[in-house]
């Protein structure tokens, strides 16, 4: 596998024991889902699920195991991002989990800045505070990296359509993260009136659900993964 070619997969914590050594060897990045925000801090509710991390590392020592925070219907992001203290609390608690369980970084899956999906809080200011939240998290990860002697990555999972692009300053965000994981499985679904393909090579120029829309807003293809 080329050093620049990355294959990532998400697994819910309760299913970590189903990830085989063969699976682990096929991946460069494994995202463990999900930590959540409670009272402004990032928590992982069932840490016993993480016992399999050492087994997967033994199977593939080069595998990056990344803690994913959020997911569909997970709130607390808008509130945490709104103030300096909130952003600091988010970043420090996230990195504390990285330190405690030996993760290789943090994945922020905020669904979605500026858009109230599944009833979670949102605000117009999320566009700017999303960048500030990532900046604080990046700084905290860098401090921890200096202490532990290894690079700790920061990635984000982003929506596949125009509303996410308009709700985030992607030209600024991309400079803070190692990877942008585009949720292309949301490009088509039962919420639309037209059928179509996920992650297809070519889209209609008027289609709001397309990778080229993200590229046009400043997201570098070298950081984008579908």
Q: Can you annotate each of these PLM segments?
A:
Residues 7-9, 30-32, 65-69, 106-108, ...:
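Hydrophobic faces of well-ordered beta-strands that scaffold small-molecule active sites
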Residues 11, 72-73, 107, 198, ...:
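Compositionally biased, intrinsically disordered low-complexity regions
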Residues 22-28, 32, 86-110, 168-186:
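Structural recognition of alpha->loop->beta junctions
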Residues 19-23, 56-59, 99-100, 143-148, ...:
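Surface-exposed acidic, glycine-flexible loop patches that form ligand/cofactor-binding
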Residues 1-98, 115, 125, 136:
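Glycan-recognition patch characteristic of GH18 chitinases/ENGases
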């Amino acid at each position: 596998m080329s050093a620049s070619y990355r294959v990532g997969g998400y697994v819910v914590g309760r299913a970590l024991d189903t990830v085989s050594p063969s699976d682990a060897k096929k991946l460069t990045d494994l995202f463990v889902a999900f930590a959540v925000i409670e009272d402004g801090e990032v928590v992982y509710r069932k840490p016993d699920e993480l016992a399999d991390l050492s087994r997967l590392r033994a199977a593939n020592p080069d595998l990056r195991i990344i803690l994913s925070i959020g997911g569909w219907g997970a709130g607390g992001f808008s509130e945490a991002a709104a103030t300096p203290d909130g952003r600091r609390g988010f970043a420090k608690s996230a990195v504390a989990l990285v330190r405690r369980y030996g993760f290789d970084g943090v994945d922020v899956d905020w669904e979605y800045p500026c858009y109230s999906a599944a009833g979670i809080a949102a605000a117009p200011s999320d566009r700017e505070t999303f960048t500030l939240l990532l900046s604080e998290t990046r700084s905290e990860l860098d401090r921890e990296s200096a202490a532990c002697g290894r690079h700790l990555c920061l990635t984000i999972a982003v929506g596949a359509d125009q509303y996410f692009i308009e709700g985030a300053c992607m030209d600024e965000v991309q400079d803070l993260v190692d990877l942008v994981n585009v949720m292309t499985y949301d490009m088509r679904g039962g919420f639309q009136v037209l059928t179509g393909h996920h992650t297809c090579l070519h889209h209609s120029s008027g289609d709001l659900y397309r990778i080229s829309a993200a590229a046009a807003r400043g997201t570098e293809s070298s950081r984008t993964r579908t």
